[in-house]
Every structure is written in structure tokens, then in C-alpha cells.
Amino acid sequence: MPKHYRPAGKKKEGNAAKYITRTKAVKYLQISLATFRKLCILKGVFPRDPKKKVEGNHKTYYHMKDIAFLAHDPLIEKFREIKVHRKKVKKAFAKKNKDLADRLLNRPPTYKLDRLILERYPTFVDALRDLDDCLTMVHLFAALPAVEGERVQVQRIHNCRRLSHEWQAYISRTHSLRKTFISVKGIYYQAEVQGQKITWLTPHALQQVLTDDVDFNVMLTFLEFYETLLGFINFKLYHSINVNYPPVLDPRLEALASELYALCRYMSSGRVPGNSEPAGLIEDKEGEDNKESSKTDESELRLAQLQHQLPTNEPGALMHLVQESTAADADDADAKECRSLFKNLKFYLSREVPRESLLFIIPAFGGTVSWEGEGAPFDETDEDITHQIVDRPTQSHVFLSREYVQPQWIYDCVNARIILPTEGYIVGRVPPPHLSPFVDNDAEGYIPEYAETIKRLQAAAQSQVLPLPSLGDEDMENSLVEAIIDRSESNEIADKKRKLEMLEKQYHDELRMEYEGKTFSNRTADNQPDVVDKSDTKEADDHMEDSHKQAEKDAADISKTLMSRKQRGLLQAIEINQERKKDKVNLLKKRKKNADSSASAKGR
């Protein structure tokens, strides 16, 4: 049969059928551009970059399947209801119908994003992998001032602050913090939760100024989704360590802006996972049981009022979050090392140091901390304090039983995983350079001087070699014998290699002498010692080195000719990257040399 005839231009194929421009997508969904942006942010739909742009390079393209996916979402209808509601409120105010306007304002249409969390993250690990930007955004808004003109409301700021402190309380309680770094942008943290490395940035505790070149509508849309995501993750993490969520804060500490320590009120609620009501609110039929329950409530309330005064160096007493159960955090190597870094150390924070950051870091590594102000667990006159964190040129009053260090010492100890010497961090002295733990010095090709010092300190701290617990005495003897045998074999291999090098050198010397006209028979007949002029030997070595380099270059050129264009481009990019690293290393070495020379000149 003849093929069915189809007029040209009636059916789209290829990229024209797969992708659609943003303008056409907005018309297809019958929504405004602002609503389209909000819908794409909440649903996780992002623009695409097709190889062949049918409508032109200046257009923004989306996948047609994504737009069809958005068309069936119930959020579109909710956004339309919100738009209609705003029109009704505006019309009621225009007609001066205050009662109708108040009724409309008290009953606005709402929507929830719980369904979107389940759609975008099928498993909990997927949600943890996408938590970096979420934590950075939430911590940013927790430090911003509330501005009604930009729709940054006070309630939203307080919610961000609550979520961030709940996250920090979990990380600190489970000792999951691994790295931290102070930069110009803020303070970087990296934690490991259920095998996933999560990195986020918190701003410095300074007065923030909102600029006019930032679109807060887009940021608030992201924040709306991130608040729901972080609340869901906190809920799952708290229940994973047998803690009910959300925690109940101590009003006294909350009023003193100590929300992180206000979580100690949590255990006073009498809730356990699985119970829907507090233990003190269960009503009994008999009067005697009612009296006993009222006495229990009074004792629990009294304990709740005094609970913040308990010593914070007890296991789990940092936030008083975890019930007495053996299902605590996993005892892996990193957790053990982090838990015992600041063990048996007591810190006191002066008022000029970054208090919230240090209150988060020090307990996460097993230390006990207090601060200057109301609601603190202990005051400055406590004789058990081992370190006082000070960031001022001089210290007026000094306790001889403690050390006064700068805040950088805490961060450097955390990154090095050892207690560093405090001589370089004392009050009034310029501290050592603050090295980033996120940079691999070996891969970069340049190791700073202080990094080498820290490596030597780490090696000294780990110098004690202990037998493995799974090996007995006989196994230890066998392992020692095997090590001695391996050592002897390696020595034999080194001797053979040395002899081969000597023979090869002798062979090259004979070739060079033969090239110059001298023979081996003449040398032996004259009974002259086998001595070669140093200058001739150097020239021969240079010639051999040049020949080796030329051979390597020829082999590299031959291998390049056998590569495809893509492989050659990749190799060229790698070589360019290596050259850039070398130039950067040379620049750093030059700067260090100039700095050392200038410092020595000043010392004179």
C-alpha cells in the first residue's frame, strides 16, 4: 500500500518536539511568569540547553515532558485560588467593606509541600545529598533582619533560626561534625550524616544589610521549599536517635537568645516516641491516681526549671535530647575521634568571640563550654576551666590555672584532630595561617609550612604503635618474621638495581671512549686506573639525559597521533591544568620567599 501522505510542517520532530521556549510554556500553562518561576522552583524543573536551538540562541528552553508534568500539578489551581483571593481582598477594601476584608484575610487559601518532598526525594539519602544549599539558605535568612517591604517576615526569620539550631543540636549531639573553616564569606562546616558529607556556609554574626540588586521573591520561594525539607529531615534524624520532635524550648533561655542551650527543656515535656499525649496530662478515673499524677507534674516542672544547671560534660547532657537507651550514634572511628578531642576540657567564651559558632563546635567534639552572660552553666571564676577563648589585644585579669587562646585555635584543632600547642595562639600574638581543610595540598603540589608542622605533630601524636587486637603473640611473631623477610628482599632488589646502574654507566663510558678513539686494550696495556675526567662524565650524563627526554617526547608524540580528537583535547586540558598548578605553586613560593626576606629585614 502507498505510504500515508502527510503535509509538510504538520508534525514536529527532533528538538522542535522535545523542547519548548519559556514564553510558549507560560502560554501553555496559562499562568504568569512569576507563578511559572515559583512552580519550577518548587517542582525542581530547570532549563535545558539543547544542541540545536530551533527558536534561537537567546531563548530559554525547557523539556516538553517537564512542562507536561507541571500542567497536571495541583499547585497551579492553588496559585489561581490565591490570586483570586487577593483580588477579593482588594475589592473589599476598595468598597470599604471591612468585615468582609477581615473574614477573607483570616481565611486565606493555603497549600502544603510535603507531597513535593516525597516526589523529589524517593529515599532519605537523596534528601541528605541535596541538603547543602538548603542549610546555607536557612542559615542565611536566620541572620537577616526582618523587612516587611521585601516580604521578609519576622515569623519566617524565627522559623529559620529554630530549624538551624535544631540541625546544629543534632550534629553536636551525634558528634557528626568533621571540618570547619573561617573565610571572608562566613564559616564553612562539613558534617557526615549516614555516610553523606554535607557542607554548608553560615554568615558571620554581623549586622546584615539587604541590597537592592537581589530578587527576594526567588530567594523566598527557595526558602519556602527548604524550610519544609529541613523540617522533614530534622524529624527523621531526631526519631533515628529516639528523640521526639519538635523539641520544647526552655522559655528562660529562649528569652536570653540561647536557643541552642534552650533545647535542654526538651526532656521535660514527658513525651516519648509513640505517645500522643504528655505523661502528666493523662487523666485517671480514681482520685488517688489524680493526686499522684499532679505530684508527678509538679516534680517534672521543678526538674525542668533546674535542668539547664546540670553539668554539660555528662554523656548526652549537651542538649538533654536523648533518652537513656543504647541506640545512640554509631561508634565508628571518626565519631570516637571527634567525641574525645576536647574530652575533659572546659572552655569559657568571652563576649567578643563568635559565641554561636563555638557553642556549636566545642560540644560536638566532646568539650564543655560556657559563656559570659545570663543562663550560662558556670561563670568565669570556675577553677575547673582549662581554656578561655579571648579575641582582644590584652587580657586585664588572668587566672593562672587556665590558658588564654584565640578562637582560631579551636578551629585549627578541629581540622587537625589533635590538641595543637597554644604558644602561637596566645592573646596579643599574630596567630599562624588558618589553613583550609577542604584543599588537598598533595594534589595541589604545594604544602604550606604550617601544614608540614601540623603533619609532624600528628605523626608525633600517633607514634605509639600497638599490636592489632585480633592478633596474638604467635601472629605478631609471624608478622615480624614476614616483615624482616620483606625487608631483606627489598634490600636485595636495591643491590641488584645498583649493580645494573653501575654496569650501564660503565657501558656508556666505554661507548663514549670508543667514540673518542680510545680502546679498552690501550687502557689495560698502560695499566692506567679506570678514571674518567669529571667534565667528560658530566657532558656524557647531560647527553644521556637529553636523549632520554627526546625519547620520551617522541613516544608521547606517537601516542598523541594514535588518540582521537576528544582524547587529545582532554590530554591538552590536563596538561594546561598541570602548568597552571605549577605556575601557582611557583607564585606561592615566590611570595613566601619575599615575605620571609621582608620579615628578616624588619627583624634587623
UniProtKB/Swiss-Prot annotation:
Residues 275-299, 518-557, 574-604 are annotated as: Disordered. The keyword rRNA processing applies. This is Pescadillo homolog. Gene3D superfamilies: BRCT domain (3.40.50.10190). It holds the Pfam family BRCT_2. The keyword Nucleus applies. It comes from Oryza sativa subsp. japonica. SUPFAM superfamilies: BRCT domain.
